[in-house]
């Protein structure tokens, strides 16, 4: 393989599905370096990986539903998780979960890490405080003036930092059912008065974007969704007849919502429909869901903005509640960098108690998401090949450090080496890189807790949680 020209070798790598590419990284340090650090290869490969849709109950459940976009494969789900699990965020191929504890996991690389929130000012007080944060029960502050926001950040197991930044806003609160979104280096919260609270975790600067909802949204009792695409912040306004897509323009000078797309809503079954809402949007696909009256089950519809057509992409069984939370998920292998610890799953399964249940739950979650990788399905379908069974693909992925006899010289980080005929530096870069227009930061992961309190009473309560980034050191391996 060393004799192959670089462009030929990259063509081979680009044809691999994400799981196979992650395995390829384990074969050789130079290949790992090329896949993980070359910005051109990463950009080309990630552009081929499609989005999938994940959802479970807003209050957490033992079931998970997921489906790839643009694939005819039936909607997949599992209902046998050992621990009640709730999805909080999804970013850069990572999932933030809550299963009695906070957990960051990458389904593709089978890496995970539990976060210790006991030293958090906002989350470490008591169990009820955590639940209040997770359920976003902060409407108690809705009518109080002089609201002040604070931010708490963690970059490790027990390293929590209370930012010195505070911001005072008008008496309004973030919408409880609208998730914060990450775009262009900042986390954004949509508030009830239409304004947007933005916080940059890197510079720890916060500001309020003074903007109102579009007039059409204010005048009609409709559904709406606040999302971030690769290029912009978007607001989706939907009625039973039509759906409007707005883009936020001139965010720094004169922010305003501009109508960019109008879609006819012709998929809802009004006679049998009990409730419905907008689920997700990524600039390429729009997702709606509805729950039915008689059968008590539900349907998930997807609209392809490029093909301008609707199709059924999933369903919601009758035993699910009507409070389903949807997340767009894109597999990524980038979090496999610098991860040294691993867990022997077979040994853990023989251990009785709650620890085994957590590991078992993670295994089931990762296995289900891995099986429906959008990129892998599209590749196999194109080549007319059948999908490999679990027994055929079962392979332990270890990223252990080589023995001392095989280690490179300790000065390897300052030396150049030849890789496929090209000079490359085999240094694990820790500099922060921007991953495209979306502003997702690679190289570290931050977990941000936002709190709000009233100056008059001094009462304080965490209101939301979000994380971003793609690399978290010392995560565990789940083979």
From Swiss-Prot:
It comes from the Eukaryota. Residues 1-44 form the F-box domain. Disulfide bonds: none annotated. This is Putative F-box protein At1g20800. It comes from Arabidopsis thaliana.
